[in-house]
A protein has these predicted regions:
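Electropositive phosphate-/nucleotide-binding environments in soluble metabolic enzymes
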Residues: 3, 19-22, 26, 35, ...
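Rossmann-like NAD(P)(H) cofactor-binding subdomain of soluble oxidoreductases
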Residues: 3-11, 15-86, 104-106
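Fold-independent oxyanion-binding glycine-rich loops
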Residues: 5, 20-21, 44-46, 74-77, ...
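Alpha-helix C-terminal capping/helix-to-coil transition sites in glycosyltransferase folds
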Residues: 11-12, 130, 182
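Internal alpha-helical scaffold of NAD(P)-dependent oxidoreductase catalytic cores
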Residues: 24, 35, 59-69, 88-175
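General beta-strand structural signal in soluble alpha/beta enzymes
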Residues: 43, 69-75, 115-119, 177, ...
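NAD(P)-dependent Rossmann-like dehydrogenase/reductase catalytic/cofactor-binding core
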Residues: 138-142, 167-268
Length: 268
């Protein structure tokens, strides 16, 4: 039965699914006294733990002593609004242990849900984080009045920027043109369900960042991710003009219109 007793829920579970926004994950887990070491933890969170500048997978691994074979991810491209309405949706289940990935897929199985599997924990998780930042940039562009022609260029460059970050920060044999990377980026940038696109749209329409955040009824992970990625990229020094533009607008009070105009000279 549903319960707000975190210890009781975790004690009785063999699989623990985390779906709280990343900004509140530490506080959410703080009361937990039941060990997670013998559990399998699945993250449905698309963000970075602020202050620690770790992905959720890294944070659970380091702070709760789980091996990467005990931690999984569930990512899109998928909006819950369509899943709840029975629309055909695709999920990607990610785990270093392929058998555990399939085990999770079986738990999420449904009539209108298809699955793909991956072992690229780092790449898929960072792709899911970055796409929220890029959806913010798309929302800003739409709010400023840019058209479909420009959006196509912006999103194509975002896909390239995402791939460049993954290749330079954690080289691996990965195909970023598949649904876990490119598909998730596309749906988050284009869908009217996208919270991050919505936040960017409000800013593009002229709202201050503070007032835009207050207008949101749900958390837009891209707001927190923009700051975290900025800090993480100090180590890697990857050229990320789109993510940098979003950071400047959100955290430095820079003009969205001016920043977008400057960005147009850096896109190909």
């Amino acid at each position: 039965p549903p319960s707000s007793d975190l210890d009781a829920v975790v004690r009785d579970a063999d699989i623990v699914i985390l779906a709280t926004p990343s900004a509140y994950l530490k506080d959410f887990l703080a009361p937990l006294t039941v060990p997670l070491r013998d559990k399998f933890v699945v993250s449905a969170i698309k963000g970075i733990v602020p202050g620690d500048y770790q992905t959720v997978v890294e944070y659970i691994h380091d702070h709760y002593g789980l091996s990467y074979r005990q931690i999984g991810l569930v990512t899109g491209p998928s909006h819950a609004e369509e899943v709840s309405r029975g629309k055909l949706s695709y999920l990607t289940v990610v785990c270093a242990d392929p058998e555990n990935a399939r085990r999770i897929g079986e738990r999420f199985a449904g009539e209108n849900i298809c699955f793909s599997y991956s072992a690229d924990l780092y790449g898929v998780e960072y792709a899911a984080i970055l796409k929220n930042i890029y959806a913010l940039s798309v929302g800003i562009a739409v709010g400023l009045g840019y058209g479909d022609n420009f959006l196509a260029v912006l999103i194509a460059n975002a896909a390239g920027e995402m791939t460049r970050f993954l290749e330079e920060s954690y080289p691996d044999e990965r195909n970023t043109q598949v649904s876990a990377y490119l598909g998730d980026l596309l749906v988050t940038c284009y869908s009217t369900y996208s919270r991050n696109r919505r936040l960017g749209l409000l800013i593009g329409h002229g709202c201050t960042v503070k007032s835009a955040l207050n207008e949101m009824t749900m958390v837009a992970e891209g707001y927190f991710a923009a700051d975290c990625i900025r800090h993480i990229n100090f180590r890697h020094r990857v050229d990320m003009p789109i993510a940098d533009m979003v950071y400047r607008v959100l955290y430095e009070g820079a003009s969205a219109r001016r920043c977008m105009q400057e960005l147009t000279t850096k896109l190909i």
